[in-house]
UniProtKB/Swiss-Prot annotation:
Post-translational modification: Is synthesized initially as an inactive proenzyme. Formation of the active enzyme involves a self-maturation process in which the active site pyruvoyl group is generated from an internal serine residue via an autocatalytic post-translational modification. Two non-identical subunits are generated from the proenzyme in this reaction, and the pyruvate is formed at the N-terminus of the alpha chain, which is derived from the carboxyl end of the proenzyme.
Cofactor details (free text): Binds 1 pyruvoyl group covalently per subunit.
Pathway noted in the entry: Phospholipid metabolism; phosphatidylethanolamine biosynthesis; phosphatidylethanolamine from CDP-diacylglycerol: step 2/2
Gene: psd
EC number from the UniProt entry: 4.1.1.65
Descriptive protein name: Phosphatidylserine decarboxylase proenzyme
CC terms in the record's Gene Ontology section: plasma membrane
Membrane topology label: Peripheral membrane protein
Enzyme class per UniProt: lyase
Modified residues annotated as Pyruvic acid (Ser) in this record: 188
Protein's job: Catalyzes the formation of phosphatidylethanolamine (PtdEtn) from phosphatidylserine (PtdSer).
Origin: domain of life: Bacteria
Site (Cleavage (non-hydrolytic)): 187-188
GO terms (BP aspect): phosphatidylethanolamine biosynthetic process
Length: 231
C-alpha cells in the first residue's frame, strides 16, 4: 500500500483526471491504429511528467524567502503590488518567475508566516512572459506576514496556455517555508513582492528551483549557516 501511496504522491492530484483521460484515449486509439496509439501514450507520458510533484530540500530559516516556483527569473523591478490586496501606492521589489511547460508547476510557500489575505482576480490570458501579464492576466494574489514581521506578496498568474489556477490556502493559515500550496496549468508565471531594500540573492536570467532557491534574506546570513529539510 505504501508503494501506491508514494506513487500518487509524486503526481499532483490535479493531474489525475488528465492522466486517466489521456491513457484511456490512448488505449482506444491503439485498438484502431498502432501509430496513433503510440502518439497517445507519448502524450500520456508527457502529462505525467508535467504534473510531477518532486520533493525538495528546503532551506530552513525565518529570515529567508525562497522561490515559490520553478522557472527563469525574468524580471526584477520596483512595482506596485496588486491593488486588490489594499497595500496602497507603496512600491515593492517584484521578482517575476516565468514557468514554461517543461517546468514543475507545483507552487510552494516562500516563507514562514501567516496568510493575511487572498484575492482571485479574473482577467485575460496574455503571454505570461510579458510585463503586462502581472496587471491584466487572471491571477491569485496572496498577502502574508512572515514570522519576522515582514509583509510579502506572492501571485499566481495564468498565461497564454494556463487556464486554471489552484490555490489551497485560506486566510489565517499558519504556513511554513516550502509547503506546497497550489499549481497552475499549463505554462504560467509567479510574482513575488518584497519590501524595498530587501537583500536579494538572485538576478535576472537565473534559473530558480521552487522550494530551494533563496530569493532574499532579511537577515543577510551566509548560505553555510542554513539548515535544510526535505519536503
Amino acid at each position: 500500500m505504501k508503494q501506491y501511496n508514494d506513487l500518487f504522491k509524486i503526481i499532483h492530484r490535479e493531474g489525475y483526471i488528465f492522466i486517466a483521460s489521456f491513457a484511456l484515449v490512448s488505449f482506444l486509439l491503439a485498438s484502431f491504429n498502432e501509430k496513433l496509439g503510440c502518439i497517445g501514450f507519448i502524450a500520456t507520458a508527457w502529462c505525467i511528467y508535467f504534473f510531477r510533484n518532486p520533493d525538495r530540500f528546503v532551506p530552513i530559516s525565518d529570515d529567508l524567502v525562497i522561490s515559490p516556483a520553478d522557472g527563469i527569473i525574468q524580471e526584477i523591478k520596483e512595482a506596485l503590488p496588486p491593488p486588490e490586496l489594499g497595500l496602497g501606492d507603496v512600491e515593492m521589489i517584484r521578482v517575476s518567475i516565468f514557468l514554461n511547460i517543461f517546468n514543475v508547476h507545483v507552487n510552494r510557500i516562500p516563507a514562514n508566516g501567516k496568510i493575511l489575505a487572498l484575492h482571485y482576480n479574473p482577467g485575460k490570458f496574455f503571454n505570461a512572459s510579458l510585463d503586462k501579464a502581472s496587471i491584466y492576466n487572471e491571477r491569485q494574489s496572496v498577502l502574508m506576514e512572515t514570522d519576522q514581521g515582514q509583509k510579502i506578496v506572492f501571485v499566481q498568474i495564468a498565461g497564454l496556455i494556463a487556464r486554471r489556477i489552484v490555490c489551497d490556502l485560506e486566510e489565517g493559515n499558519e504556513v511554513k517555508t516550502g509547503e506546497r500550496y497550489g499549481i497552475i496549468r499549463f505554462g504560467s508565471r509567479v510574482d513575488v513582492y518584497l519590501p524595498l531594500k530587501t537583500a536579494l540573492l538572485v538576478s535576472k536570467g537565473q534559473t530558480a528551483i521552487g522550494g530551494e532557491t533563496i530569493i532574499a534574506d532579511f537577515g543577510r546570513k551566509k548560505t553555510a549557516e542554513f539548515k535544510f529539510e526535505r519536503k
